[in-house]
């Protein structure tokens, strides 16, 4: 039970908790203005013992109802067989066990759960799925959320891939807070599966048991796993993924639908400069896009999508090289993250989905997750839909059992499965369509006139905004809040028994609303080191300059030292650089460059490739990724904001090109 002092101090409904150390939960009516940012938390991955296959037995119902703890849920006379030990199968197994059913999961290979084999990277669990996990088991939901990294209380959204400028920001925080839902997190897929598998118990998951066939005689279902004996249960749940054997046996073989995109994915030890303010971004380009997300622990996960025929193969150790070729010329956020990723950490796969279907099952067999509604990853809702499926299926089985117990008649398993399917089809179908639509939008995105016009592509160099980009933003700004509100909160009313609440540990920075509306305020909030990095092949003699964020320490740049001027003096001994050429100062969270009168001038190249001369004695704001040129192209520097300055640049004796 929560402490009475905390409970009495905050209005709203409260629910009991089974662990005293759980984060404080507060009512959804608590003022949203009081949510402020906290750093992401993560837990060490645990270990799981190898699961041995055992024969399941039909549990007997208790003779008399007794009060039991959560670990002693009275079992019911219902044996549920589950094909597939992925996230959907394991979440459903947990939900079924919590409701007292005898569940047995057949999994072909649990090496991923044990942390072996290729690392598949993190998974985003959004507010709707986290709420479903809470409705299944609050303790389990807390453990999963504590192991994840919160991204929903930061800025997320669409970005132009070339310039890095924000195109549309997504507010996933407000829909969650207004509905009393957990805030979106990213968690290691392996960690999530380990938590779910550990809580099942060793007698629940059958390893090396791939379900390839089954028989439904109307009263029971018998499965025939490879290399295993037959098992019989009251129903079968196919949670065996996009290439589901259960689905094939139900409805016959069917072709997957290729999305038109191949996907490179990787994870890197990399911390962006704006890690405290930005969670995930989708960088848009014509027929290609790049997704990056903070996953906690100083790591970033990314996905790079490129429109091309299926079945492509890279040369040995050639994935990174091709990735940089495809996205060459894109903004620093994309290039830096790609460069920071090791070759052996990059995977490639073609993206497929399945068209929506009205047939989810037959008789005593039903499907769940990717086996019936595999969708493209553009909304991050594939795993979330499987979690929602799991909750709904367990709920419908529980209702059918209760009706059976009250009436004294046999449980109507078949009707309960059809009820589950009916409850899920519309919502899943809409989200499936939205995921496809997101891919179409990415394919059609054109930042400038001339993009994709072949012989007329030279028009691109004039950087004229494409009309579709302007019009598209209007419709996205109008429709995105409504879409996010429904996707994240549209299933909340079906979560029976879950009390709406929010956590103080999920509070956002009090400037979050301002950041959504003001790109400049968002950039000024970046807590990072600012550097001038030599740009171009002719700058081998130049060294990195570290700029000071002390407003009383401006940086004076010239061909000779100016030790008598307050601040730092940087010497660039080139003939095109005047004695006192320019000054860089810091004011109000922004860097300003002031050019003095000189024969060769000072030039800026902004993040969209536009080059212009800086007017003398007129301070000009510059941004990360801009290029500043002192006198000529031989003294060009790229401006870069970094969370941590390079060690070589941090040394004081290397902060200037010449003696100061």
Swiss-Prot record:
EC number assigned by the record: 1.14.15.21
Catalytic activity: all-trans-zeaxanthin + 4 reduced [2Fe-2S]-[ferredoxin] + 2 O2 + 4 H(+) = all-trans-violaxanthin + 4 oxidized [2Fe-2S]-[ferredoxin] + 2 H2O; all-trans-zeaxanthin + 2 reduced [2Fe-2S]-[ferredoxin] + O2 + 2 H(+) = all-trans-antheraxanthin + 2 oxidized [2Fe-2S]-[ferredoxin] + H2O; all-trans-antheraxanthin + 2 reduced [2Fe-2S]-[ferredoxin] + O2 + 2 H(+) = all-trans-violaxanthin + 2 oxidized [2Fe-2S]-[ferredoxin] + H2O; beta-cryptoxanthin + 2 reduced [2Fe-2S]-[ferredoxin] + O2 + 2 H(+) = (5R,6S)-5,6-epoxi-beta-cryptoxanthin + 2 oxidized [2Fe-2S]-[ferredoxin] + H2O
Pfam families: FAD_binding_3, FHA
Places the protein is found: Plastid, Chloroplast membrane; Plastid, Chloroplast thylakoid membrane
Membrane topology listed for this record: Peripheral membrane protein
Binding site for FAD: 79-107, 357-370
Involved pathway(s): Plant hormone biosynthesis; abscisate biosynthesis
Primary location recorded for the protein, binned into one broad class: plastid
Induction details: Up-regulated by oxidative stress and when chloroplasts undergo differentiation into chromoplasts.
Range of the transit peptide: 1-49
GO cellular component, one term: chloroplast membrane
Cysteines engaged in disulfide bonds, as pairs: none
Entry keywords, A to Z: Abscisic acid biosynthesis, Chloroplast, FAD, Flavoprotein, Membrane, Oxidoreductase, Plastid, Thylakoid, Transit peptide
Cofactor list: FAD
Record keyword Transcription regulation present: no
One annotated GO biological process: abscisic acid biosynthetic process
Residue ranges constituting the FHA domain according to the UniProt record: 545-609
GO MF term set: FAD binding; zeaxanthin epoxidase activity
Domain of life: Eukaryota
Keyword Transit peptide: yes
Function: Converts zeaxanthin into antheraxanthin and subsequently violaxanthin. Also acts on beta-cryptoxanthin. Involved in the epoxidation of zeaxanthin.
PANTHER family: PTHR46496, ZEAXANTHIN EPOXIDASE, CHLOROPLASTIC
Name of the protein in its database record: Zeaxanthin epoxidase, chloroplastic
Species this chain originates from: Capsicum annuum (Capsicum pepper)
């Amino acid at each position: 039970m929560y402490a009475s002092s905390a409970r009495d101090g905050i209005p709203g409904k409260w629910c009991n908790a089974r662990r005293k150390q759980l984060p404080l939960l507060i009512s959804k009516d608590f003022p949203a203005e009081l949510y402020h940012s906290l750093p992401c938390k993560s837990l060490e991955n645990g270990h799981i013992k190898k699961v041995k296959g055992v024969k399941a037995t039909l549990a007997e119902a208790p003779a008399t109802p007794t009060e039991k703890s959560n670990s002693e849920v009275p079992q019911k006379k219902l044996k549920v067989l589950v094909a597939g030990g992925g996230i959907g199968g394991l979440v459903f197994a947990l939900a079924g066990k919590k409701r007292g059913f005898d569940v047995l999961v057949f999994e072909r290979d649990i090496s991923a759960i044990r942390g072996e084999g290729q690392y598949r990277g993190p998974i985003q669990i959004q507010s709707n799925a986290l709420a479903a996990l809470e409705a299944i088991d609050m303790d389990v939901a807390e453990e999963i959320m504590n192991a994840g990294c919160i991204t929903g209380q930061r800025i997320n959204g669409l970005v132009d891939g070339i310039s890095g400028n924000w195109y549309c920001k997504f507010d996933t925080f407000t829909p969650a807070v207004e509905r009393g839902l957990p805030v979106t997190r990213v968690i290691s897929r392996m960690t999530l599966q380990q938590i779910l598998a550990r809580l099942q118990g060793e007698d629940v998951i059958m390893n090396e048991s791939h379900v390839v066939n089954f028989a439904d005689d109307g009263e029971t279902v018998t499965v025939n796993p490879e290399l295993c004996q037959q098992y019989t249960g009251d129903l079968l749940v196919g949670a065996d993924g996009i290439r589901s054997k259960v689905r094939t046996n139900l409805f016959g073989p069917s072709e997957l639908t290729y999305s038109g995109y191949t996907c490179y994915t990787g994870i890197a030890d990399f911390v962006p400069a704006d890690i405290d303010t930005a969670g995930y971004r989708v960088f848009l380009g014509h027929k290609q896009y790049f997704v990056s997300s903070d996953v906690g622990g100083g790591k970033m996960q990314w996905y790079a999508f490129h429109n091309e025929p299926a079945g492509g193969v890279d040369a040995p150790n050639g994935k990174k090289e091709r990735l940089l070729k495809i996205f060459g010329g894109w903004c620093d956020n994309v290039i830096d993250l790609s460069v920071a990723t090791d070759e052996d950490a990059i995977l490639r796969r073609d993206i497929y989905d399945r068209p929506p279907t009205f047939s989810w099952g037959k008789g005593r067999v039903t499907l769940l997750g990717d086996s019936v509604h595999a969708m493209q990853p553009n909304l991050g809702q594939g795993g979330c839909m499987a979690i929602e499926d799991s909750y709904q299926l367990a709920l419908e089985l529980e209702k059918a059992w209760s009706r059976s117990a009250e009436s004294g008649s046999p449980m109507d398993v078949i009707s309960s499965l059809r009820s589950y399917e009916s409850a899920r089809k519309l919502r899943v179908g809409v989200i499936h369509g939205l995921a496809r639509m997101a891919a179409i939008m990415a394919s059609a995105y054109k930042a400038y006139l001339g993009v994709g016009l072949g012989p007329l592509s030279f028009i691109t160099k004039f950087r004229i905004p494409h009309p579709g980009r302007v019009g598209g933003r209007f419709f996205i700004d109008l429709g995105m809040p409504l879409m996010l509100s429904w996707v994240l909160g549209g299933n909340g009313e079906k979560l029976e028994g879950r009390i709406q609440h929010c956590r103080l540990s999920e509070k956002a920075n009090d400037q979050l609303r301002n950041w959504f509306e003001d790109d400049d305020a968002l950039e000024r909030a970046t807590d990072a080191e600012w550097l001038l990095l030599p740009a171009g092949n002719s700058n081998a003699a130049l060294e990195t300059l570290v700029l000071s964020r002390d407003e009383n320490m401006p940086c004076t740049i010239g061909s000779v030292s100016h030790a008598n001027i307050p601040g730092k003096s940087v010497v660039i001994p080139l003939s095109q650089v005047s004695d006192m050429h320019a000054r860089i100062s810091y004011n109000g969270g922004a860097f300003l460059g002031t050019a003095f009168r000189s024969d060769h001038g000072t030039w800026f190249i902004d993040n969209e490739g536009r080059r212009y001369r800086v007017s003398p004695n007129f301070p000009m704001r510059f941004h990360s990724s801009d290029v500043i040129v002192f006198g000529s192209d031989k003294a060009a520097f790229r401006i870069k904001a970094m969370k941590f300055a390079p060690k070589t640049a941090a040394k004081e004796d290397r902060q200037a090109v010449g003696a100061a």
